[in-house]
From Swiss-Prot:
Organism: Chlorobaculum tepidum (strain ATCC 49652 / DSM 12025 / NBRC 103806 / TLS)
HAMAP family to which the protein is assigned, alphabetical: Glu_tRNA_reductase
GO BP of this protein: chlorophyll biosynthetic process; protoporphyrinogen IX biosynthetic process from glutamate
Further remark: During catalysis, the active site Cys acts as a nucleophile attacking the alpha-carbonyl group of tRNA-bound glutamate with the formation of a thioester intermediate between enzyme and glutamate, and the concomitant release of tRNA(Glu). The thioester intermediate is finally reduced by direct hydride transfer from NADPH, to form the product GSA.
Binding positions for substrate per the UniProt entry: T49, C50, N51, R52, S109, E114, G115, Q116, Q120
CDD domains (UniProt xref): NAD_bind_Glutamyl_tRNA_reduct
Entry keyword annotation includes Oxidoreductase: yes
Pathway: Porphyrin-containing compound metabolism; protoporphyrin-IX biosynthesis; 5-aminolevulinate from L-glutamyl-tRNA(Glu): step 1/2; Porphyrin-containing compound metabolism; chlorophyll biosynthesis
PROSITE patterns (alphabetical): GLUTR
Name of the featured protein: Glutamyl-tRNA reductase
Keywords: Chlorophyll biosynthesis, NADP, Oxidoreductase, Porphyrin biosynthesis
Family under the similarity heading: Belongs to the glutamyl-tRNA reductase family.
Reaction catalysed by this enzyme: (S)-4-amino-5-oxopentanoate + tRNA(Glu) + NADP(+) = L-glutamyl-tRNA(Glu) + NADPH + H(+)
Amino acid sequence: MNIISVGVNHKTAPIEIRERIALSEVQNKELVTDLVSSGLASEAMVVSTCNRTELYVVPGMPEVNCDYLKDYIISYKNARNAVRPEHFFSRFYCGTARHLFEVSCAIDSLVLGEGQILGQVKNAYRIAAEVGTAGILLTRLCHTAFSVAKKVKTRTKLMEGAVSVSYAAVELAQKIFSNLSMKKVLLIGAGETGELAAKHMYAKNARNIVITNRTQSKAEALAEELGTNRVLPYESYKEHLHEFDIIITAVSTKEYILNAAEMQQSMAKRRLKPVIILDLGLPRNVDPEVGALQNMFLKDIDALKHIIDKNLERRRAELPKVKAIIDEELVAFGQWLNTLKVRPTIVDLQSKFLEIKEKELERYRYKVSEEELRRMEHLTDRILKKILHHPIKMLKAPVDTADNIPSKVNLVRNIFDLEEPNQSLQ
């Protein structure tokens, strides 16, 4: 029994290729169902995100190998004119397991340690389970991957520290003010960057968020999504600057929208109570001289990127610990995988000795009392258990490579004169 995987990701193919191969949830279900119903695979699962489309398969026919699956996906997506086999990676046996473990704990991600990929892998398994294409092997593989990700999260610091500008801004605000639930926040700009910052703020328990934007309807839509319903007209927000403890700017402009004179007036009204200004604009939205004012903490994108770089450096330092966890789980998974290969021989061995026992006991069934027969049966069961203990232990013992398994199996089958294994048990 083997498991193979092929796919495209940010390491193997540019974005235009990844877009051509990407699968919707409907296509995901259709692809894995077709593979299994046709007998090409006994199990199948697809992990499809914005950065990767990866197919995991337990082959059902000898001709189903990595090259076959690459061609299958290209054909399914009608992408032969743009996508080539060279755009794909290939993995098999424990290499497939290692890859999924690395994907699940986010060391194979574009952003090291990002938190979304585990949920995406879980969704891939959910889809396969729903349509019935996740069998014993994929189920064990996925649950081991989930366990790896959990251990990485609890035993390492791989996922600690902000690695996006908007999240770094919020993390910095929390370090300065500690309890954001008590602070009043003004968001200037409701575009993508501002929206992310507002959502991160909300996730950190900031509930008093006021939004202003050139297009008021956009500010109102974001406010409604956050559940604040608090919006200031863009023309008049400067009249209220003194009311806010945290100001986030994220607008597209060539001119500073806040200058030192305006903020000095605001600070006077606040009686010098501290203010954090997080300038997420590019070009900058806030005059750098604002940062020189008393109790005014101004951080722009460059300052935040310095924080991000430090956090990424700390995450990279955790990689040896992460890889040690993966190696540990990979050994256990490989040993379990090997037991599947020897299971038919173990079943046949036990069946043969059980048959011998039954035949021999049958010869004495009418020659002894029921009590004596019961004792004989109990005795032979104990003898058989001891006789079979070492052969079964040897079959289950870890091996250096999967190539060593057939030699062990053949040795046992020849010694005990077992018939060809039942393929349905493999």
